[in-house]
Amino acid sequence: MNKAEQLVKLLIEKKYTVSFAESCTGGKMAARIVDVPDASKVLNASIVTYANEAKMKYANVSKDTLKQYGAVSENTAREMAEGVAKANNADVAAGISGIAGPTGGTEDKPVGMVCFGFYIDGKVFSDTK
């Protein structure tokens, strides 16, 4: 059983729905879930918010957060996750933003850096890889 299958199984068991707000992954997270049988029981919504304007409009990321921390930050990823969860009444959500490359990286935010925001049952947390 792959990770997507494990996630769908767990979400079904808990009777949770999931939504995604993706940037650098371009919808690949949701696509993995859709490939799993019974995904329709758990996948609520998925949006690709590549541009900052889309992050603000569809994932409720504040302009101030983008200005202060940038599109690739844990703050932005958290707001993406919370925004897409609340907009779609999801129990669980993920916000993903990063530097896909091959250019665009900096010393502080190198190519390959990805920030993850998670919303689970009203709690929000994040991580960077």
Residue ranges and their predicted role:
Residues 1-129:
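Short alpha-helical segments enriched in small residues
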